[in-house]
Amino acid sequence: MSINRNHQFYKLVFEGILLTMFFSLYSCSNNDNEAVDVIPPSSYDSLKPIGFGENTTGGNNQNITVVTNAEQLAEAVSGANPATIYVQGDITLDNMLAVGSNKSIIGLYGATISNLNCNENAGIFLLKGSNNVIIRNLTLLGPGAYDIDANYSDNISLVGAKNVWVDHCDIQDGIDGNFDIVEGSDSICVSWTRFRYLIAPKGGGSGGSDDHRNCNLIGNSNNTADLDAGHLNCTFICCWWGDGCSERCPRVRFGKVRVVNCLYDGNDFKYCVGYGVYSNIYVEKCAFVSEKAKKKALKDYRGDKDFNIKVVDCLGIDDVELSQGEWGQFVPNYDYKAFNADMVESVLKNSENGAGATLKILL
């Protein structure tokens, strides 16, 4: 026991020395307000959007600002002028923020944004018609699942948004959902992001559900082909659906969606991936490790007749290809070298550089 304690002590001392050195060097040499990640990222991390969303550049290091409160953040994310916004500390919102175009919203190490309202003022970021937005390295906290049947009350809501990259976020306890992509949104990449519910669900909301821990909805109606056909194309890379997630991880209508190197280890799944009307889904080298995830991996949602889903080289479930309708299976043709499914859990759960808001970004 004493050897283990000594080992941990010296490990902490060494890490402290390293961080002190980085802080010292950075304060002396970095005077242009560019951020640095002081802990090396995972060797599997591309550090850029891949596939759908690959052309997203966000604020492109222009008009750099640091925000520390809700008023500053609301002002910084508005409008269409390019801006790179660093979030410092803990920010609490009273209502959802409308995010404009050409923005990078990046959390410095440990940054959180929360909105704990259980009403129509719930939600954190609304991207309605926005284009070219990056959201990175933020912990986003909602009040817990409570079905109030409100539009756009998720921690992140994309409504007709294009070219969006969400990377290394920890998205928790959304009131309606954690992160929904609807109404013709397109070219979306979600990478290295953790989804979970740590607050017990609350019943009695106007929507009627007693357990609305429904994480990621892609397409919110079967009757929106005029908006959604040819859109809702998304890539999920190295994402982790865990504690408390019940369903919609994701649940897809209309879009082409690739889910690759993702982890499912929660114990509350009613299902993991839901395939609905005109969905075209490619699930590749993912790890379904909990018993619930293995048994409830896929769901044919309400008997929709036009869909394609293919599962390839995953851990915990068999390969399968299911198809109804006259169109062909979507096969990704963009460059991403997926690693083996039996490595997914250890890579994504690495506390130093795995999925979630793990980037040690400093200014």
What do these predicted ranges mean?
Residues 2-15:
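Bacterial N-terminal signal peptides that target proteins for export
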Residues 2-3, 23-42:
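Bacterial Sec-dependent N-terminal signal peptides
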Residues 13-24:
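Bacterial N-terminal signal peptides
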Residues 50-86:
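Acidic Gly/Asp/Thr-rich repetitive segments characteristic of extracellular carbohydrate-active
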Residues 74-82, 89-106, 113-136, 142-162:
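Extracellular beta-strand-rich solenoid/capping regions of secreted or surface-exposed proteins
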Residues 102-111, 131-144, 160-173, 185-207, ...:
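Right-handed parallel beta-helix
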Residues 123-124, 155, 178, 201, ...:
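Structural detector of coil-to-beta-strand junctions
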Residues 251-363:
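Extracellular beta-rich repeat passengers
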